[in-house]
């Protein structure tokens, strides 16, 4: 079960147990479940309500509590990917999750400039974050998709 929504019996026994990492998910199992429909990883970004996050529904039925992410952020969330904070229900952009433990900048020594490499999912995530930052606030809740 997810730490935030475990039944009283399972969460009360938390002092006796150590929290385990939630189930792996996403392409190649490189992400971790943050909620029943949220899968995030350093290299992947976050999948919300997509096929990549389907496995995360299994976590609800496991008796021991789990928690993904290392650094607390936002309102009861944890840093899920570079610049993203998630709780078990949703994700938001969060500057304090941009760099640090688990989200190092990668710089190639062979590059003539000291720019950060943005390959594949990292570049796509950055582009999406820039688009989201420039977009007006949506009038209705976000639809399932890749963020």
UniProtKB/Swiss-Prot annotation:
MF term (GO), any: V1A vasopressin receptor binding
Gene Ontology biological process terms in this record: vasoconstriction
Sites of Glycine amide modification: 9
Name of encoding gene: AVP
Protein name: Vasopressin-neurophysin 2-copeptin
Organism (species): Ovis aries (Sheep)
Family to which the UniProt record says this protein belongs: Belongs to the vasopressin/oxytocin family.
Annotated site (Important for agonist activity on V1aR/AVPR1A): 9
UniProt keyword terms in alphabetical order: Amidation, Cleavage on pair of basic residues, Disulfide bond, Glycoprotein, Hormone, Secreted, Vasoactive, Vasoconstrictor
């Amino acid at each position: 079960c997810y730490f935030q929504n475990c039944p009283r019996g399972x969460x009360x026994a938390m002092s006796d147990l150590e929290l385990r990492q939630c189930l792996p998910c996403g392409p190649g199992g490189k992400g971790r479940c943050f909620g029943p429909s949220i899968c995030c990883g350093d290299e992947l970004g976050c999948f919300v309500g997509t096929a990549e996050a389907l496995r995360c529904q299994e976590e609800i039925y496991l008796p021991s509590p789990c928690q993904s992410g290392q650094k607390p952020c936002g309102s009861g969330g944890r840093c899920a990917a570079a610049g993203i904070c998630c709780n078990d229900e949703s994700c938001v952009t969060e500057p304090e999750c941009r760099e640090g433990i688990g989200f190092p900048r990668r710089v190639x020594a062979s590059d003539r400039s000291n720019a950060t490499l943005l390959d594949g999912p990292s570049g796509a995530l950055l582009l999406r974050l820039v688009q989201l930052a420039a977009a007006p606030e949506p009038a209705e809740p976000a639809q399932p998709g890749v963020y």
